[in-house]
């Protein structure tokens, strides 16, 4: 099992000309800063190839999603870490933006595709499938607060968790919710649907 250290990326947009910057033939400058931690944990769960976690939501009636923004089928899922430094503080996940991100709703696009875990999870076939109408997937904190996809780690506001010390190191269970959500202004398709999102562990 390999060890992973993930950056917490912060981006700042400079909106006005600044006298300390050289004159450039453009409308502005984007400054990107970040930090790489040498404090690492081992991802214990999911332990599968590429750490793919499959969250199976219950089969529900389309009538459970009558109104825009309605959620149903909320299902908890865990990402477990072990062999973390004992002095490490609270951790959380950052859900990465990507092809499955709906930047308008802050949710994950649902595709009419059956996920085949036994086939080593070929995710490229998911995002190339037909998009489902009227329904997406939502991630949330345990209190139901929407974790908005396609935003920075501060705006995303994923819940943090403290670790448990065992035999001189810490272990963590990072727990969140996944559910169906009614997409605005569309009737809900009845279909087998799938989506996915990458995650990074945010270190203090």
From Swiss-Prot:
Tell whether Disulfide bond is among the UniProt keywords. yes
Name where it mostly resides: other
Could you tell me which cysteines form disulfide bridges?
41-84
Q: What keywords are assigned to this protein?
A: Disulfide bond, Fimbrium, Signal
Q: Where is the signal peptide?
A: 1-25
Q: Gene3D superfamilies, from UniProt?
A: Fimbrial-type adhesion domain
Q: Which GO terms describe its biological process?
A: cell adhesion involved in single-species biofilm formation
Subcellular location, record wording: Fimbrium
Q: Which domain of life is it from?
A: Bacteria
| Keyword flag Disulfide bond | yes
Identify the InterPro entries for this entry: Adhesion_dom_fimbrial_sf, Adhesion_dom_sf, Bact_Fimbrial_Adh_Pro, FimA-like
The molecule here is called Serotype 3 fimbrial subunit
- Origin organism of this chain? Bordetella pertussis (strain Tohama I / ATCC BAA-589 / NCTC 13251)
Print the organism lineage.
Bacteria, Pseudomonadati, Pseudomonadota, Betaproteobacteria, Burkholderiales
């Amino acid at each position: 099992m390999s060890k992973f250290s993930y950056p917490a990326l912060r981006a700042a947009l400079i909106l006005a000309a600044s006298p300390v910057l050289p004159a450039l033939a453009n409308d502005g400058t984007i400054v990107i800063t970040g930090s790489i931690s040498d404090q690492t944990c081992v991802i214990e769960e999911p332990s599968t190839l590429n750490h793919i976690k499959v969250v199976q939501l219950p089969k529900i009636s389309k009538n459970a999603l009558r109104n825009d923004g309605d959620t149903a089928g909320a299902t908890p899922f865990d990402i477990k870490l072990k062999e973390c430094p004992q002095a490490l503080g609270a951790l959380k996940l950052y859900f990465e933006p990507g092809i499955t991100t709906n930047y308008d709703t802050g949710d994950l696009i649902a595709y009419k595709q059956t996920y085949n875990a036994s086939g080593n999870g070929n995710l490229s076939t998911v995002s190339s499938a037909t998009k489902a109408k009227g329904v997406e997937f939502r991630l949330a904190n345990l209190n139901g607060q929407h974790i908005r996809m396609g935003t920075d780690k501060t705006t995303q506001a994923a819940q943090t968790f403290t670790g448990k010390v065992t035999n001189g190191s810490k272990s963590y269970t990072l727990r969140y919710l996944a559910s169906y959500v009614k997409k605005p202004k569309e009737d809900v398709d009845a279909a087998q649907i799938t989506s996915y999102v990458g995650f990074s562990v945010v270190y203090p």
